[in-house]
Amino acid sequence: MRPQATLTVLPVERPLVGRVSPPGSKSITNRALLLAGLAKGTSRLTGALKSDDTRVMSEALRLMGVQVDEPDDSTFVVTSSGHWQAPQQALFLGNAGTATRFLTAALANFEGDFVVDGDEYMRKRPIGPLVDALQRMGVEVSAPSGCPPVAIKGKGGLEAGRIEIDGNLSSQYVSALLMAGACGKGPVEVALTGSEIGARGYLDLTLAAMRAFGAEVQAIGDAAWKVSATGYRATDFHIEPDASAATYLWAAQALTEGAIDLGVASNAFTQPDALASQIIASFPNMPAVIDGSQMQDAIPTLAVLAAFNRQPVRFVGIANLRVKECDRISALSNGLCAIAPGLAVEEGDDLIVTANPTLAGTTVDALIDTHSDHRIAMCFALAGLKIAGIRILDPDCVAKTYPGYWDALASLGVSVQR
């Protein structure tokens, strides 16, 4: 574990003005790394994120015989035979949910015994629904605790057929099945059940990446897809900036009435979390109810921004935040209440931020427990722009997805104390 250091963001007294280039998208980078590893040939991935989450994915591929070179700080060059070898050791994936779920399904397409494992936090994050789905497809896979570690006995390819999975659950399970399906022994149909489809935008990211790497995917109605067993073709692939990272900068601009140029328009993103830009633009008149189901990684940003809104905000459709890197609903509620008692309330799986714009300019004594969750650390830094005395525990956990976050704030004139 990282040492429990703290960091304090010092309030700013002027608008934040400058240019910051957000890092590449974590979601797209790990999809592209997986697909490049499954493809035969050499793929060049530009604009990529280099962080803890993408490092564990690239290292896992290397352990299985895939060559992954890094000629610069935003490029991966992936050369693969299209066949992975079972390593002698477990694939350790830290607390990277994308890498863990995506690899668990993909490994069913290869021969050998594999173990997918993670750190103490990943070992508390559910993977049972994906394991159950793979078992129904004939894969020999087990995760006795319902969380990693996961043992997979690969038999050379997913069997052709149809698999149903609850669309209310994590979109990462669905993406994992879709991406693995193209390397199976025959066509695979993935159908969603349930009353709602959570995080549909992330499925669109998956389908776009699959098609870019040569997969043939056909939509069957609104909630099912047929994936042909074509495999993947190596390709050059550019990765857009991370929309979740952009939300912190959009919010910093809104809070300080600044002008931060990200080098990309908010409507140019394909990632679903970019939807938050419209809500941030409405600050300090954010809506009374915000449905977070399609932009879950943006909710921490919006929740802290809502603390300074002119009216209370209820966040709905965010139940999956309880099984992210930590229980983000509770972490947000506890952190906001550390700043001001009663500033947030949990009602079931909803989060209500009561809002108090008069907090700006005050001084508090608040220690924010991030639970080593990068998004909790980054979002509460925003509160520090307006309120003195907010200390953030384990600030270096931002390395999971945005290693340069504190430097980015410094480049805009924000001072921090460690």
Curated annotation (Swiss-Prot):
Pfam families: EPSP_synthase. 3-phosphoshikimate binds at residues 26-27, 31, 170-172, 297, 320, 324. Gene3D superfamilies: Enolpyruvate transferase domain. The active site is at 297 (proton acceptor). It is found in: Cytoplasm. PROSITE patterns: EPSP_SYNTHASE_1. GO terms for molecular function: 3-phosphoshikimate 1-carboxyvinyltransferase activity. SUPFAM superfamilies: EPT/RTPC-like. Phosphoenolpyruvate binds at residues 26, 97, 125, 172, 328, 375, 400. CDD domains: EPSP_synthase. GO terms for cellular component: cytoplasm. Pathway: Metabolic intermediate biosynthesis; chorismate biosynthesis; chorismate from D-erythrose 4-phosphate and phosphoenolpyruvate: step 6/7. It catalyses: 3-phosphoshikimate + phosphoenolpyruvate = 5-O-(1-carboxyvinyl)-3-phosphoshikimate + phosphate. Signal peptide: none annotated. Monomer. Belongs to the EPSP synthase family. Catalyzes the transfer of the enolpyruvyl moiety of phosphoenolpyruvate (PEP) to the 5-hydroxyl of shikimate-3-phosphate (S3P) to produce enolpyruvyl shikimate-3-phosphate and inorganic phosphate. This is 3-phosphoshikimate 1-carboxyvinyltransferase. It comes from Pseudomonas syringae pv. syringae (strain B728a).
